[in-house]
């Protein structure tokens, strides 16, 4: 055998590893798959009206095309955290990538909204694994100090995806929307080959029973069902059914009760859960708990804004999907360099608290300005407000994981990192569904008295979001009325994020600015050439 494992200390701490060509090959593959998952979270936003218009009419609300991706993406992340211990990093990440690519094929070949929603669900299942495992594997290979750089680069991937995804969505919506999904196949194939050939990480040996316990089947089943129920409620509420309808509040109540039951199963010792995916001690540490909260809030704000801004430009400024993506550049462009700069500063200084303060301050100021957008907002105003918000969003991308991992023991690496990925994506669920629901609910409420004129033109409760691209074709008198309603509703949706940004800033006072040591904290080790075959205790290769 030409590749063997290096011996690790009992506490899972090892010196910084040499960054040879194999490390960079693995890192490139992880960046590719992270790019795919991030791309499909946001590319659909600008293309959604065109996709819905191209498919046969359906009673399924358009925002289910988004929600169907987010639901399994959120719920699968803790599952893949457990799988990474039971099946190993390699088998788990390859499985996630294959599932994602299969979902992409289903979406690309869909001839109805129903099939597209199913395909998006399969995509989301794989995307959740990709999101969690890329960060777990990078934590296996880097020290806490240098992790800021590499997570800054991964954050850079998410920022770049947020930057170009709306553009690609706009381009494909005008030519052939299935290419939004076909484009994943060649990129995913390259990453798959690299991972199969070069990713060889050993994890501590587990017995068959321990592997099953690591999966936490009961806890994950409760979590999946609870998230599903909540998402059904927030997706249908105010759009397909009134909030007072039992078909909305019953699943909402059941889902919230289920989330409480999930935490009870996870945190109270018992036979149902021997190896919780969300162990209580992750949140018993104040610094880790605050960092998880901030990760969640960042996900709410970032993904909510990136979905609503293109809708504003399409509906109010008469932009095409492609043009609306270009006009969103001031929001996404600052995120790209600032995510990397923030990661570099953390690696140089070993500190993160001041950067977190700066990130939240910029985000709160920028988001607060967005709430003033109206029909008459000038180019300078919408550009500068996006730049400020985007700067804060970019700074926050790489800097909430280091305090989590620095404050928790090494044996919690997989659970801590999967919970981090879950927190951001769960935030995305609430950000996207919350913002679009507020927008659609407020717009529909104000437009109902005029549905007699609008419904024959295709605008009703079910088409409020999809109709954004078509407002410019309305008769002038109706266009003025509807644009005013849409602008007010979009402003209402932005107000969701203002108190959350303020909470994020205030919670930073509770963080401890822990030092980030320059050693690797992980019980899993990348095989290195030249090591003796018996250099370590028997472990499973995956």
Curated annotation (Swiss-Prot):
Stretches of the chain forming a coiled coil according to its record: none
Transmembrane parts of this sequence: 24-44, 51-71, 98-118, 124-144, 151-171, 179-199, 215-235, 248-268, 296-316, 326-346, 355-375, 384-404, 419-439, 490-510
GO molecular function: transmembrane transporter activity
Principal subcellular localisation of the protein: membrane
SUPFAM superfamilies: MFS general substrate transporter (SSF103473)
Subcellular localization, as worded in the UniProt entry: Cell membrane
PROSITE patterns per record: MFS
Membrane topology designation: Multi-pass membrane protein
Inducing factors: Expression is induced when cells are grown in cultures containing vegetable oil as the carbon source.
InterPro entries: MFS (IPR011701), MFS_dom (IPR020846), MFS_trans_sf (IPR036259)
UniProt keyword annotations, A-Z: Cell membrane, Glycoprotein, Membrane, Transmembrane, Transmembrane helix, Transport
Biotechnology section: MELs not only have high potential as eco-friendly biosurfactants due to their excellent surface activity, but also have attracted considerable recent interest because of thei runique properties, including self-assembly, anti-tumor and cell differentiation induction activities, and moisturizing and hair-repairing properties.
Cellular component GO terms held in the UniProt record: plasma membrane
UniProt-annotated glycosylation sites, renumbered to this chain: 285
Family assignment from sequence similarity: Belongs to the major facilitator superfamily.
Function text: Glycosyltransferase; part of the gene cluster that mediates the biosynthesis of mannosylerythritol lipids (MELs), surface-active substances that enhance the availability of water-insoluble substrates. MMF1 is directly involved in the secretiopn of MALs.
Annotated protein name in UniProt: MFS-type efflux pump MMF1
Species whose genome carries this gene: Pseudozyma antarctica (strain T-34) (Yeast)
Source lineage: Eukaryota, Fungi, Dikarya, Basidiomycota, Ustilaginomycotina
